[in-house]
């Protein structure tokens, strides 16, 4: 399925109860692995926290309406362009995506494309359970950035 960019529903649904994902982030020569914790706060703010398994905070972001707030972020990622890319990625993940289009879709996976050239992003969704993707891979081909999210279930910590 291809076509013009249309408003697509969020890839992941933020909820009042914390959702946890295994996080693997590769940026240039840096590799980080840990956990992504996402929670919708009572005022509809979405908190996005990335940390290592040992508790070191990688980043702490807030999405409120269409505003992206950097509460904290480690040095290799604290560059203006990098934060802008992460802002776009997290908005595409948790808010309606206005500029994305579905490139491929089947019963087992979906691929969405957002942006062009330097800002091109490929979202690959798979492992659907009740319409929600259990695995999400975000790739930025031109800047060697890859983010892999695997949902952690209560039964499978």
Q: Where do the language-model regions lie?
A:
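N-terminal leader/targeting segments and the immediate start of mature chains
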Residues: 1-37
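Edge/loop elements at the starts and ends of beta-strands within beta-rich repeat scaffolds
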Residues: 12-16, 39, 44, 61-63, ...
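Residues at beta-strand starts and edge strands
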Residues: 17-19, 30-32, 44, 132, ...
